[in-house]
Regions:
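Active-site environment of non-heme Fe oxygenases that use a 2-His-1-carboxylate facial triad
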Residues: 1-150
Length: 150
């Protein structure tokens, strides 16, 4: 089964109910790193990214890919508490929908707003195939600007 978590709603909840957590998650850069045989991807960004008007822009969360930020001890404690609480919210049914994709179905979603997850899978019970395709926002926004230009 698959699940989607609304990162915008999680961020908004934090902003209004845990402003100290929201502040540290929107101000602390975290290093994300993925390595395989062909690739080394590294990015430094905030778990909750805001735009220049302090509006929600993106959520990032990967317990396997993010590295400990270099912070003073008291700030690090706050960051970890905030990260743990955000993880709890992301796993809460209050912000998550669950669904099952059948053969031939496709799920399309905004990867900047939504977090995607899958339940554990026992390969002895069947077969699961997931194929991802990603479109960068700047590509689609650029195409939209071109189409709207007189």
């Amino acid at each position: 089964d698959s699940s989607l978590v609304d990162g915008f709603s999680v961020a908004n909840f934090l902003k209004h109910n845990q402003p100290e957590f929201y502040k540290v998650l929107t101000e602390t850069n975290v290093t994300f790193k993925f390595t395989d045989i062909d690739t080394i991807l590294v990015d430094e960004a905030k778990l909750i990214e805001l735009d220049h008007n302090n509006n929600f822009r993106q959520i990032r969360f990967s317990g396997r890919l993010d590295y400990v930020p270099l912070l003073e001890e008291n700030n690090l404690d706050l960051f970890y508490k905030a990260r743990k609480y955000m993880f709890k919210l992301c796993n809460s049914d209050d912000f998550k929908i669950k669904f099952r994709l059948s053969k031939g179905m496709i799920a399309m979603f905004d990867n900047l707003r939504l977090l995607h997850g899958r339940t554990k899978f026992d390969p002895n019970t069947g077969f699961r195939h997931l194929q991802g395709c990603y479109i960068d926002h700047d590509v689609t926004e650029g195409k939209l600007r071109r189409l709207l230009k007189p």
